[in-house]
């Protein structure tokens, strides 16, 4: 039988929330090049060797996770969901992960560090067993998603929410720690923009996962909940070791562990589940980094007040005249 292809009809809502998330994603859209980073150079030069090393490593770790989420995770989930609008929103989010978030970290590296140091930290990414396990565990769940199989899709969505609402935050901690003290503010501005993106990603995919979960029998729901908690525990135990490996040299590992437990509970909330970890007081400096005067840390806000969008000018014929060797003149 010949397949009938249908077009995306944006004049008709597929559900009561996807177009809202589309609009919010577009309102929040930003580009790495629109944020100047040179203002961080003076602070960076006065940081100790261990502080610089930890900062570089957490950003490199975030780069790996964003790369895999943009290249693998979101595209696979998008492929298996129904609805053109839902696919569009997920594909937009996938684009943000690699083309914007991962590139932003590279822009920070290029501003603050020499090429040799940048190359070293990307080699560290490939050799750090805790970071590699984190990526491998999440990607392996994505790879099990099967066509027309809602259970495997639900599990992939759970992995996605855990990545974006939980695992990223061990990396976000250190930039927020400085940002909350008024240091490395331009880099912190980028982190806040990324966090706001990840917030709506986690909420949106969480809503899609909840739809599938609610359709299951009580027994199947119990099985899926147990599976999700087992995955969370596996990721959490690895995250504790990763945190010690990266943050022990700056004496912040205990604080970071509190922060990741706090965000693990938020990830569970996004999936419609209750908190698993006990409530703890998170370092107020880091919370301050999420609630600075230049920011409204609310994923239903537009771009932060500290964000300056580039001026857009009409194209002129002269814009297409290139003088570089090998270009058309």
From Swiss-Prot:
PROSITE patterns: RIBORED_SMALL
Binding-site residues, Fe cation 2: 97, 164, 198, 201
Record flagged with keyword Metal-binding: yes
One GO CC annotation: ribonucleoside-diphosphate reductase complex
GO molecular function annotation: metal ion binding; ribonucleoside-diphosphate reductase activity, thioredoxin disulfide as acceptor
Cofactor: binding comment: Binds 2 iron ions per subunit.
Cofactor: Fe cation
GO biological process terms held by the UniProt record: deoxyribonucleotide biosynthetic process
Binding site for Fe cation 1: 66, 97, 101
Catalytic residue positions: 105
CDD domains listed in its UniProt record: RNRR2
Record EC number: 1.17.4.1
Function: Provides the precursors necessary for DNA synthesis. Catalyzes the biosynthesis of deoxyribonucleotides from the corresponding ribonucleotides.
Protein's name according to its UniProt entry: SPbeta prophage-derived ribonucleoside-diphosphate reductase subunit beta
Species this protein is from: Bacillus subtilis (strain 168)
Taxon lineage: Bacteria, Bacillati, Bacillota, Bacilli, Bacillales
This protein's encoding gene: yosP
């Amino acid at each position: 039988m010949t397949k009938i292809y249908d077009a995306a009809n944006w004049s008709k809502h597929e559900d009561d929330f996807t177009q809202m998330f589309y609009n919010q994603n577009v309102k929040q859209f930003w580009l790495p090049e629109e944020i100047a980073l040179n203002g961080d150079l003076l602070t960076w030069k006065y940081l100790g060797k261990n502080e610089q090393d930890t900062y570089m490593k957490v950003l490199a770790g975030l780069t790996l996770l964003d790369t895999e989420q943009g290249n693998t995770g979101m595209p696979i989930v998008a492929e298996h969901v129904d609805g053109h609008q839902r696919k569009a929103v997920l594909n937009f989010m996938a684009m943000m992960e690699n083309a914007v978030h991962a590139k932003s970290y590279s822009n920070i590296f290029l501003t603050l560090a020499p090429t040799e140091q940048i190359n070293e930290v990307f080699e560290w990414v490939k050799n750090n067993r805790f970071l590699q396990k984190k990526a491998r565990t999440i990607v392996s769940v994505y790879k099990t998603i099967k066509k027309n199989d809602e259970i495997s899709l639900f599990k992939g969505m759970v992995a996605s929410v855990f990545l974006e609402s939980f695992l990223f935050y061990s990396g976000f901690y250190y930039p927020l720690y400085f940002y909350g003290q008024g240091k490395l503010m331009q880099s912190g501005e980028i982190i806040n923009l990324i966090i706001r993106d990840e917030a709506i990603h986690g909420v949106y995919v969480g809503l899609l996962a909840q739809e599938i979960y609610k359709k299951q029998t009580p027994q199947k729901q119990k099985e899926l909940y147990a599976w999700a908690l087992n995955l969370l525990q596996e990721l959490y135990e690895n995250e504790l070791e990763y945190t010690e490996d990266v943050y022990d040299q700056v004496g912040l590992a205990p604080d970071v562990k509190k922060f990741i437990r706090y965000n693990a509970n938020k990830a569970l909330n996004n999936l419609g589940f209750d908190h698993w970890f006990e409530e703890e007081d998170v370092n107020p400096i880091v919370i301050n980094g999420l609630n600075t005067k230049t920011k409204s840390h609310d994923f239903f806000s537009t771009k932060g007040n500290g964000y300056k969008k580039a001026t857009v000018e009409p194209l002129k014929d002269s814009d297409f005249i290139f003088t570089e060797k090998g270009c058309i003149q």
